[in-house]
């Protein structure tokens, strides 16, 4: 049994929150769930939990905010569907943000422990009873989509055309095969372990995509080595082989997953880790170019902010003594929303912030106005195999900085710089 599923004595309270699949998960094998608009939930792995609780202050801006621990239970409805429900956990030192104070989407419905009864499960209304009603409504909507995804999940790269006139964000949640796959696998693992226990500890983390209307997400596996010091010989050999057969060995980074909305063509593009492993260095560069391309032209205004954040992160990691971030990923996130176009003959003050798009790229009479489009995020995630001399129980203590991870960051900086220079910036 994996560390995330070891028996733990946890005591659920009287109220719980129904956890939903996190639709913007593009990589990793651990299931990530949506707790509320700004908070995600994933199985607690002791080493990752330890990392977040002892995180160096200067690294905090490059990792999701840690919000605490919850107890998660599951119920099976009459159709044998499993639903995961989170309960508050007494005694955790993290701060659980139970009320969404974000003003990014003030009109959105928020899940709380004590309000919104259509989302909160109270003791007098059994979870099973509530779940049956909820599932019955959702089943009719999702049945056809599930049938369509049987073949989509087998594809390493897929495109899906969306209705550009509709709400792209709402359509996006239906078409992420990797998210569906991880959610189904998580439920199956919990079902198989049901005889042993029905309660698990999950950690709560900041939802990095919550401030973006149409999140474009790139998941990069960083470093030249992926296996932890505690890996078995078989596991280590398997991870070494994956690195040797991918760009990890050559440039210290490989694509682990990608989700891009190309507003110009009205397509969603998904790429999974299996395709990422097959990419050559040139293929990796092309994938990065594709990530920053909206189907009509390159989003050049994103490249400068990305380079700045990568350089800042590199400087921070160069100061971290004895840390090794084995199998950790780096997320790059920006908004793929198509912003309104502004006519070139508009008033001067309207043109003040226009991007420098040429006439042929912007269909002649218009230039593209990326309002807030340069807002891009770069964060480290997944620390289940991180090690440091602060973790006294580790049998291996490393010296100096994580050269493999830093090498991958420098490669990334070089490639994004190359894309920027080739595009004429």
UniProtKB/Swiss-Prot annotation:
Residues that hold ATP according to the record: 206-208, 219, 382
Residues binding substrate, per UniProt: 215-223, 235-242, 385
Protein's pathway: Phospholipid metabolism; phosphatidylinositol metabolism
GO terms assigned for molecular function: ATP binding; flavonoid binding; inositol hexakisphosphate 5-kinase activity
Transmembrane segments annotated in the record for this chain: none
CC annotations in GO: cell junction; cytoplasm; fibrillar center; nucleoplasm
Pfam family, one: IPK
Keyword Metal-binding: no
Principal place of residence: nucleus
GO biological process: cellular response to flavonoid; inositol phosphate biosynthetic process; inositol phosphate metabolic process; negative regulation of cell growth; phosphatidylinositol phosphate biosynthetic process; positive regulation of apoptotic process; protein stabilization
Keywords for this protein: ATP-binding, Kinase, Lipid metabolism, Nucleotide-binding, Nucleus, Phospholipid metabolism, Transferase
Reactions this protein catalyses: 1D-myo-inositol hexakisphosphate + ATP = 5-diphospho-1D-myo-inositol 1,2,3,4,6-pentakisphosphate + ADP
Tissue expression per record: Detected in kidney, intestine, liver and heart.
Enzyme Commission designation: 2.7.4.-
Location relative to the cell: Nucleus
Superkingdom assignment: Eukaryota
Similarity-based family: Belongs to the inositol phosphokinase (IPK) family.
Function (record text): Converts inositol hexakisphosphate (InsP6) to diphosphoinositol pentakisphosphate (InsP7/PP-InsP5).
This protein's name: Inositol hexakisphosphate kinase 2
Organism: Oryctolagus cuniculus (Rabbit)
Gene from which the chain derives: IP6K2
